[in-house]
């Protein structure tokens, strides 16, 4: 059984930080998910145009078994530079894979993925640099992260309306926690064109938009400029997982993306999901029970990913010609 929750803190073992550049030709940013003491990592890339870094290291056959942080960032391939800033900050703290005899001789392991938001602030050359990574890392905290048009979600757009950064978490009956941090920036739509409802509203928490609101949403979708996009995210858990299991979690989390966005995984998207497991809590005591418990964790990963997509869209605020969902359909939230 899944229990959704709204805590003041990120689940144990992780910190999240944003750096946002909004205004004066800027509309982009960077988000860092920091794993305290490192975490087992996995990844699944399904979009047709991904922009990633260090994803090969997460394959179960490679030697690296602990990930220090994951960077989610705007700026398309240019934005991968933000990971350099995170590496520099971690190196200064002596955090990373040891490669020498001295404590400071480390290589921080920092996978990254990007969204396409180039030029959305008005200046094509304004995109994240290594400084963005440094500032996002410095801002990392165990407090529940701000969501909406912040960090990597600052310049996010989906199907003609404003996207954003979202966060959701849940706790399984076993006590294992699962959370997702997602940047919703899709070529597809997050809105059911017939009803005007958000695909991700699986619990029917929101009211149905009025006829004028549905028309406004349909117009925004029809006028949307089709361009490169990408939805990216990190599933976090305090469960003890192997690298193979972490990769499976990342793969199944894409089911949540598919529930929230239609179509998804297009040739215009670079959809990428990471999984980080802090290995603080066992999912079950024996192998048979562990398989059933792991299945529950997989289902939870998909659910929280969809919920984080919903959160990112609802928390977003309009920028320029991109109105937010709640601006176009204010009655849905009362």
Model-derived segments and spans:
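Active-site-surrounding "flap" and adjacent substrate/cofactor-binding loops of secreted or lumenal enzymes
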Residues: 87
């Amino acid at each position: 059984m899944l229990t959704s929750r709204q805590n003041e803190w990120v689940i144990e073992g992780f910190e999240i930080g944003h750096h946002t550049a909004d205004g004066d030709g800027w509309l982009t940013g960077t988000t860092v998910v920091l794993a305290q003491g490192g975490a087992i990592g996995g990844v699944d890339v399904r979009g047709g145009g991904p922009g990633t870094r260090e994803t090969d290291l997460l394959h179960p056959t490679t030697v690296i078994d602990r990930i220090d942080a994951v960077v989610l960032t705007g700026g398309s391939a240019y934005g991968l530079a933000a990971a350099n800033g995170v590496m520099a900050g971690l190196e200064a703290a002596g955090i990373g894979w040891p490669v020498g005899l001295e404590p400071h001789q480390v290589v921080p392991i920092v996978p990254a993925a990007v969204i396409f938001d180039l030029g959305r602030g008005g200046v094509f050359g304004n995109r994240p640099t290594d400084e963005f990574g440094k500032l996002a890392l410095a801002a990392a905290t165990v407090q529940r992260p701000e969501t909406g048009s912040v960090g990597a979600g600052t310049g996010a757009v989906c199907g003609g309306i404003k996207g954003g950064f979202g966060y959701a978490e849940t706790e399984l009956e076993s006590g294992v926690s699962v959370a997702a941090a997602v940047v919703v920036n899709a070529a597809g739509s997050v809105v059911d064109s017939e009803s005007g409802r958000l695909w991700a509203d699986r619990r029917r928490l929101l009211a149905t938009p009025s006829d004028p609101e549905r028309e406004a949403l349909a117009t925004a979708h029809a006028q949307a400029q089709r361009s490169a996009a990408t939805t990216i995210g990190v599933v976090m858990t305090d469960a003890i997982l192997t690298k193979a299991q972490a990769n499976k979690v990342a793969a199944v989390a894409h089911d949540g993306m598919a529930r929230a966005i239609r179509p998804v995984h297009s040739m215009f998207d670079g959809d990428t999901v990471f999984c980080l497991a802090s290995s603080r809590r066992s999912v079950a005591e024996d192998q048979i029970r562990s398989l059933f418990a792991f299945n529950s964790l997989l289902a939870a990963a998909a659910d929280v990913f969809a919920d984080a997509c919903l959160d990112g869209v609802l928390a977003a605020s309009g920028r320029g010609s991109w109105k937010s969902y709640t601006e176009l359909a204010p009655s849905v939230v009362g």
